[in-house]
Amino acid sequence: MKICILYGGISSEREVSINTGKSVYNSIHKEHYVSMFDFDGDYDKLYDNVKDVDLVFIALHGGDGENGTIQKFFESENVKFTGPSAVAAEKAMDKNIAKLICQKNNIPTPNWALDFIIEDGAMSMSDKFISSGFVVKPIDEGSSFGITIFKQAPSESEFRKSIKKARKVSESIMLEEYIEGRELTVSILGNNSLPIVEIIPKGDYYDYESKYTKFQSEYIVPAKIDEEIEELLCAYSLKIHKLIGCVSYSRIDFRLSKDNKIYFLEINTLPGFTDTSLFPKSAKSAGISYGELINKIIKLSI
């Protein structure tokens, strides 16, 4: 099979994408005819490199690779590709839309606000949760870029600094209630959930360094949680996967509060596949090697 691995890109997650692309290539180049294309935003060059392949393996993260733009292009050119459809990618990338979908379907998610302003040295926000802990995050970026966590109400200068940090990666920002508790993620492959991973970062939270630097986080697979919680997490994940419109694979992130309440955080339609990535860890716990995982995704995408 002729496969083109599409990687790199021009988003803030370029470095992660390069690592994912290389890992995917190393796992399948001996059994398929594999080429690699480092996408630089030029769609004419992109088409020239993919027009004769059987499948494009999208190893991009963030930006056009994950917001539906690349997917829409491939759909218009009848090029087969891995990952979500254009519509599903667009829904998932916008954290506000994904949370609204969950809220509408009775899946708990932390309170959030989009309508906030900083004026004349004062913060004005409509939601009461802002007075306690909250997270400032870009609506449409991954890998924890631009995120600031406040476990208690910040000073005005701290808040301004966090907004500036978030706006370096996106103009669209949301404030989300901070949920004290455990970080859990569920990987979906086809119509099945894989073993749940608990993430325990060595730092204050699971930031970029914790995600992509070896030994900066501890991963417990499968997570040591009650069977009832496990079943509910898997049920929620499969439901979200389908509501968003994903088919082949996705990864859904949650918080489990101290009183064992589950909260949806976000869905990743093109999760990382680096050496430290969560999806391969989950698959390995289920007895699926990295190479087998990539080939399963390929088969689900043809």
Report residues per predicted region.
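Phosphate-binding site of ATP-dependent enzymes
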Residues: 155-238, 256-263
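Glycine-rich phosphate/pyrophosphate-binding beta-alpha loops
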Residues: 143, 202, 268-282
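Active-site nucleotide/adenylate-binding loops and adjacent lid/helix of ATP-dependent enzymes
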Residues: 1-7, 50, 91-176, 180
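ATP-binding N-terminal substructure of ATP-dependent carboxylate-amine bond-forming enzymes
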Residues: 1-87, 91-93, 97, 116-125, ...
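Hydrophobic beta-strand scaffold residues
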Residues: 34, 80-81, 109, 134, ...
